[in-house]
Amino acid sequence: MIIGITGGIASGKSTVVKVIRKAGYQVIDADQVVHDLQEKGGRLYEALREAFGNQILKADGELDRTKLSEMLFSNPDNMATSSAIQNQIIKEELAAKRDHLAQSQAIFFMDIPILMELGYQDWFDAIWLVYVDAQTQLQRLMARNRLDKGKARQRIASQLPIEEKKPYASLVIDNSGDIAALIKQVQSALLSLANPR
């Protein structure tokens, strides 16, 4: 069984993943896969450098993720170019990791922030959506990424609204409360997995 984990930016997916890993389950982290591919010499690094030039690199030749983010979120054409380049490479890499893990794990998870936006729904037997109300999401994103309200709203707007993701979810984990309530929901869901009725 493969379970997809998704949710809006700053919704609390990382905390959910920590609880799942602590329970002994494997989780493929799409953001980490992307990060690895963007390392100097990686497939995405080379593809992005070819598309946007050396202006997206730091002095030491590493990818300047902050500069790249600013370029993408401020310009829809740049975002479209980047998405077209990256999505295929990322999909290939995630599929390889999924297929490898499926050989040894009966149940595992894949944390993909923009799962619905990229059309990954068919990969999963179940999808867990981490939900947070819009105001809380905005405040958390501003605090976490040190963004002003305008930039935070811009990032949130680049993703499918959470309400449009809900119909795809087999489980909605509500993270509008405190961390203890979030952990309890995840532990309960994991218990149901281990002991299906």
Curated annotation (Swiss-Prot):
Presence of keyword GTP-binding: no
SUPFAM superfamilies tied to this protein: P-loop containing nucleoside triphosphate hydrolases
**Signal peptide bounds:** none
- GO CC annotations on file: cytoplasm
What EC number(s) does its UniProt record assign? 2.7.1.24
Residues that coordinate or bind ATP: 10-15
Keyword set, alphabetical order: ATP-binding, Coenzyme A biosynthesis, Cytoplasm, Kinase, Nucleotide-binding, Transferase
Pathway listed for it is: Cofactor biosynthesis; coenzyme A biosynthesis; CoA from (R)-pantothenate: step 5/5
The primary site where this protein sits is cytoplasm
Boundaries of every DPCK domain copy: 2-197
Which PROSITE patterns has this protein been placed in?
Answer: DPCK
Which transformation does this protein catalyse, written as a reaction? 3'-dephospho-CoA + ATP = ADP + CoA + H(+)
Disulphide-bonded residues: none
Compartments, as annotated in UniProt: Cytoplasm
State the InterPro entries in the record.
Answer: Depp_CoAkinase (IPR001977), P-loop_NTPase (IPR027417)
> What molecular functions are annotated in GO for this chain?
ATP binding; dephospho-CoA kinase activity
The Gene Ontology biological process terms listed for this entry are:
coenzyme A biosynthetic process
Concerning its family, UniProt says: Belongs to the CoaE family.
What job does this protein perform?
Answer: Catalyzes the phosphorylation of the 3'-hydroxyl group of dephosphocoenzyme A to form coenzyme A.
| Matches recorded under PANTHER family | BIFUNCTIONAL COENZYME A SYNTHASE-RELATED, DEPHOSPHO-COA KINASE-RELATED
HAMAP family, per the entry: Dephospho_CoA_kinase (MF_00376)
Q: What is this protein called?
A: Dephospho-CoA kinase
Write the lineage as a comma-separated list. Bacteria, Bacillati, Bacillota, Bacilli, Lactobacillales
